[in-house]
């Protein structure tokens, strides 16, 4: 009873299902037969097919000859290996699935297996047979040797000419120091005859020595007298190099210019002194004092002035010397010692002194200094009338 009740319930259920799907069912037997056939087909399909979860693409060589490693398609709905043999990828459509068994690109293609080509005969290079570097080395070596030879030659020539130049400088120094005997005697005579009466005053000897050292840079005594020589002996002048100026000519030009300066200073001194002597002889004196420059003198030369009578005017002669005259310090400091008439008488007076030696003592120098006449300009005012009978008040 129970089994029959179950079967009836089952059939009723099937009938209801068939009506809901709109399937025609003419009879219960036909419906039962149709339903039985459908159930059998569903059972066969469930047993033969399983759900697809992933697909694996094999590794292959692509069209460039590069190896692509294998990979698995299991991301989301992309579960199938699709594409071509040379390019593979994952897709979600089963009908686009690639049959990988038909592809042949799983091995290395023969065209990609290229070996190293054999070397050509033209590309072979033998360093031992190449002579280009050797030629370059030879040229550079020759140039370096020539440069060294030139440098050493120049150094040798300079060393060879150096002793000659030293000998020339020494010979020039000897020529300037040595003078002819005749010229030395003539200089002594001229200095003895034309010596000035004021050249023995040594009150300002220190200042005179400094001025003389600045003018000609010549040493005392014999060195100074030798520097006054106009030209050395022709036989003693060394032969200079043809391409450079002679040192002897330079020295001679230097001393000639210094000599001209000394002569000009002497002319200025004697011009002022002669003007004062003329005014004193006429009996008239200027309103203002006449400035007299220091008379050039040579403190190392012997003195031999000539004696003149009183009342006669002495002619002033020039002595080629670069030392200025040293006046006594009491010439202007004590103006009351001499009067105007004594000045007039003193200007025309010359004292004679014999030649002295260089070893004169200081006492003799003081006596000679006190014996020399002193220039004095009166401090009293007077007027110039150019008259012989002028009277000073």
Swiss-Prot record:
Annotated TM spans: 132-152
GO cellular component, one term: dendritic spine membrane
Major subcellular site: membrane
First and last residue of the signal peptide: 1-20
Highest taxon of the lineage: Eukaryota
Region annotation Disordered: where it falls in the sequence: 28-52, 307-340
A Pfam family annotated for this UniProt entry: Shisa_N
InterPro entries in alphabetical order: Shisa, Shisa_N
Membrane-protein topology: Single-pass type I membrane protein
Glycan attachment positions: 38
UniProt record, GO biological process: regulation of short-term neuronal synaptic plasticity
Extracellular side: 21-131
Cytoplasmic side, ranges: 153-393
Composition bias type Basic residues, residue spans: 310-321
Quaternary structure annotation from Swiss-Prot or TrEMBL: Component of some AMPA receptors (ionotropic glutamate receptors) complex.
Functional summary from the UniProt entry: Regulator of short-term neuronal synaptic plasticity in the dentate gyrus. Associates with AMPA receptors (ionotropic glutamate receptors) in synaptic spines and promotes AMPA receptor desensitization at excitatory synapses.
Family, as annotated: Belongs to the shisa family. SHISA9 subfamily.
PANTHER family: PROTEIN SHISA-9, PROTEIN SHISA-9-RELATED
Protein name listed in UniProt: Protein shisa-9B
Source organism of the structure: Danio rerio
